[in-house]
Amino acid sequence: MSLSVTRENFDEWMVPVYVPAPFIPVRGEGSRLWDQQGKEYIDFAGGIAVNALGHAHPALREALNEQANRFWHTGNGYTNEPALRLAKKLIDATFAERVFFCNSGAEANEAALKLARKYAHDRVGNHKSGIVAFKNAFHGRTLFTVSAGGQPTYSQDFAPLPPDIRHAAYNDLNSASALIDDNTCAVIVEPVQGEGGVIPATKAFLQGLRELCDRHQALLIFDEVQTGVGRTGELYAYMHYGVTPDILTTAKALGGGFPIGAMLTTQDYASVMTPGTHGTTYGGNPLATAVAGKVLDIINTPEMQNGVRQRHDAFIERLNTINVRFGMFSEIRGLGLLLGCVLQTEFAGKAKLIAQEAAKAGVMVLIAGGDVVRFAPALNVSDEEIATGLDRFALACERLQAGGASCG
């Protein structure tokens, strides 16, 4: 008989790095979740842009179960068929010629930064070690990636931090140009800053970074952990902008809810990562890669990408209607199904309160800082779920505007 647990047990037993919602989800289907009490929620959070095909998708369950009935793990001393098939699918679908599999976005970014440093050291010299990143970015929680993130809140308690990392202002090419020089080995950037407020890069900004990297022989890394695998209406956001990076990192939606990450690059850059220079025990395991292969099969189609663009329009239309009623947002922005509602000054700092009130109304949303409510729903969310979920979100906005919301 399984142990009966409650939300209070989290506070008793877990390291307190999170403050989870007061309810515990126990079952999901598509874009809906149910908690221990049987209450239904429409999920516009998507596990933070992870559940690209919703919960318990039949094809993903089938892929997982089929591989689970064969074998689960061998370690990196052996390869496996699902990993090789997934690598070929990613290569065929992108600019990449080589793939490194890992378990998360942080690990993918760690690998990308290490590759960039090693490539520069091997081809030029150890002096070429500088990394330029951007303020308010998010690249993961390892010491290297959290240092690149440019959010002191996440890194200041862990000094001394890795050296030679500098931060420019996002979408400001002059700021970046002032930092990128011949000693720069890499520039790492999110095509849309997710945690930083759902801020899409301008095309001119990314094109300018490409030109600066070419001029100074630095590698351009696109962190597509949040924007990748169909989220923006293209398989990867670099395709939306027409700017090709040297290295791309992907995770989150790649596994549709099963942990996996990957670093994609060209043969030339990958060649410096010789045996023993980097590795992972679980990366590229057959369970994860079998599921991810099925995710790509479903998402990498014109029908799915066109559907994302149509659902984007539906969200924008309804969010604008909500804003006409309540006047809470100064801007509604984003690409595809990664959207952010920026709060007016009157409601500054209340994004978390809105998210809490939304959950009470039966819809799950995210925040991106204190002033932005973020949406990252499943890419196959239905029209009915969009309508019902945003009706519930409107109710939360109404309650907050009326002063009836509380932090409880």
Curated annotation (Swiss-Prot):
Q: What does this protein do?
A: Catalyzes the transamination of N(2)-succinylornithine and alpha-ketoglutarate into N(2)-succinylglutamate semialdehyde and glutamate. Can also act as an acetylornithine aminotransferase.
Cofactors named for this entry: pyridoxal 5'-phosphate
* Known EC number: 2.6.1.81
Top-level enzyme category: transferase
PROSITE patterns named in the record: AA_TRANSFER_CLASS_3 (PS00600)
Q: Please name the GO terms that the record assigns under molecular function.
A: identical protein binding; pyridoxal phosphate binding; succinylornithine transaminase activity
Q: What is this protein called?
A: Succinylornithine transaminase
Keyword Transferase part of the UniProt annotation:
yes
What InterPro entries has UniProt attached to this entry?
A: Ac/SucOrn_transaminase_bac, AcOrn/SuccOrn_fam, Aminotrans_3, Aminotrans_3_PPA_site, Class-III_PLP-dep_AT, PyrdxlP-dep_Trfase, PyrdxlP-dep_Trfase_major, PyrdxlP-dep_Trfase_small
Entry keywords, A to Z = Aminotransferase, Arginine metabolism, Pyridoxal phosphate, Transferase
Which sequence positions carry the modification called N6-(pyridoxal phosphate)lysine? 252
The coding gene here is astC
Q: Which GO terms describe its biological process?
A: alpha-amino acid biosynthetic process; arginine catabolic process to glutamate; arginine catabolic process to succinate; ornithine catabolic process
Regarding protein family, the annotation reads: Belongs to the class-III pyridoxal-phosphate-dependent aminotransferase family. AstC subfamily.
Q: Write out the pathway annotation from the protein's UniProt entry.
A: Amino-acid degradation; L-arginine degradation via AST pathway; L-glutamate and succinate from L-arginine: step 3/5
Pfam family membership, one:
Aminotran_3
Q: Which Gene3D superfamilies does this UniProt record tie to the protein?
A: Aspartate Aminotransferase, domain 1, Type I PLP-dependent aspartate aminotransferase-like (Major domain)
Q: Which domain of life does the UniProt lineage start with?
A: Bacteria
Instruction: Name the source organism.
Output: Salmonella dublin (strain CT_02021853)
Write down the chemical reaction(s) this protein catalyses. N(2)-succinyl-L-ornithine + 2-oxoglutarate = N-succinyl-L-glutamate 5-semialdehyde + L-glutamate
